C-alpha cells in the first residue's frame, strides 16, 4: 500500500513471539538494518519514502528483556494486546488486529479515545490478528462520531478467492523474505499452483542470500493474502471511492507496475544512509 500515490504507511512491529517469523525478522532478512537505525530516523523515513517500519525494540527498549520469555511461552500475552496501542507514530487512520473477537469492541473503544479519525479493528474467525484469507473476519469500524459498527467481511467482498490457512502459513524469516521479494520482482510469474520444486530467488533489492521458497508453496495464495490486507488499508485511507474491490485493484496495480517495489527500494536506501555504525 505504501507504493500507492497519496499513501503514507507506518507499520509498527517487532520480532515473532507466537509464530515462526515476525515482520521484523522478515525485513532484516531483506537487508533492512533495523537494529542500526535510530528511532527518530525510522519516523523520518515515512516522509522520505512514503512508508516505514517502526521496529518496536528501538522504541520500547524496556521491553526488550521480555522478548525471549514471550517467545518461549508460545501463546499471546498482554504484550500482544499492548503492542498496537503504543504505536510511536500517531496517525489519523489505521488498521489494527486482535487475536480474539472478545477483544474487538474493547480495543475499538480504547483506540477511539486516542483520537483516531477512522479505523478498523479486525479479527479473523479462526483467531487471526488480521483479515482471514479463508473465510469471514470480524470488523469493528469506528469514525470520529464514536459510533462502533460491527460487521463481517470475506475475501470475496474484496473480489479475491479464499485460501486455506495452510496455504498461507509462515515459513522461516528468510523464506518469507524470498516470497515477498519474488512477488515484488516477478508479479507476472505468480501461478495459482503449489511449487513443484524449491524456488531460488535472486534479490537485487538488498543483495542478500535468501533461503529458497519451499516446494509446495502456493505463491498466488500468499499474494492474495497480502493484497487483502493492503486493500483494507487503502479502503480505510479513503481510496477506491468506498469500494473494497476497487481498493483491491489499486493494491494489485501497485505491485504489477512496480510502484510497491520502488517504495521498498527507497526505504532500503534511506535506512542504509542513516544507520549508525
Which residues make up each language-model segment?
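Active-site-proximal loop->helix
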Residues: 16-33
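Glycine-rich anion-binding loops and their surrounding alpha/beta cores
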Residues: 6, 28-36, 41-277
Amino acid at each position: 500500500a505504501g507504493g500507492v500515490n497519496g499513501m503514507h504507511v507506518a507499520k509498527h512491529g517487532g520480532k515473532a513471539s507466537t509464530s515462526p517469523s515476525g515482520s521484523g525478522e522478515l525485513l532484516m532478512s531483506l537487508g533492512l538494518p533495523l537494529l542500526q537505525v535510530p528511532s527518530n530516523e525510522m519516523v523520518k523515513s515515512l516522509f522520505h519514502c512514503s512508508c516505514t517500519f517502526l521496529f518496536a525494540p528501538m522504541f520500547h527498549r524496556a521491553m526488550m528483556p521480555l522478548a525471549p520469555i514471550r517467545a518461549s511461552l508460545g501463546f499471546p500475552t498482554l504484550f500482544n494486546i499492548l503492542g498496537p496501542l503504543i504505536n510511536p507514530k500517531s496517525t489519523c487512520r489505521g488498521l489494527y488486529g486482535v487475536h480474539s473477537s472478545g477483544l474487538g469492541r474493547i480495543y475499538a473503544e480504547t483506540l477511539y479515545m486516542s483520537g483516531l479519525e477512522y479505523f478498523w479493528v479486525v479479527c479473523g474467525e479462526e483467531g487471526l490478528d488480521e483479515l482471514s484469507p479463508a473465510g469471514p473476519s470480524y470488523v469493528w469500524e469506528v469514525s470520529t462520531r464514536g459510533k462502533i459498527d460491527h460487521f463481517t467481511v470475506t475475501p470475496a467482498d474484496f473480489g479475491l478467492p479464499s485460501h486455506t490457512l495452510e496455504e498461507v502459513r509462515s515459513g522461516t524469516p528468510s523464506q518469507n523474505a524470498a516470497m515477498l521479494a519474488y512477488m515484488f520482482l516477478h508479479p507476472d510469474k505468480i501461478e495459482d499452483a503449489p511449487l513443484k520444486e524449491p524456488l531460488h530467488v535472486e534479490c537485487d533489492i538488498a543483495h542478500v542470500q535468501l533461503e529458497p521458497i519451499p516446494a509446495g508453496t502456493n505463491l498466488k495464495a500468499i499474494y492474495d493474502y497480502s493484497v487483502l490486507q493492503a486493500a483494507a488499508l487503502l479502503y480505510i485511507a479513503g481510496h477506491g471511492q468506498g469500494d473494497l474491490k476497487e481498493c483491491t485493484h489499486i493494491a494489485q496495480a501497485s505491485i504489477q507496475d512496480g510502484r510497491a517495489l520502488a517504495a521498498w527500494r527507497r526505504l532500503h536506501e534511506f535506512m542504509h544512509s542513516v544507520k549508525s555504525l
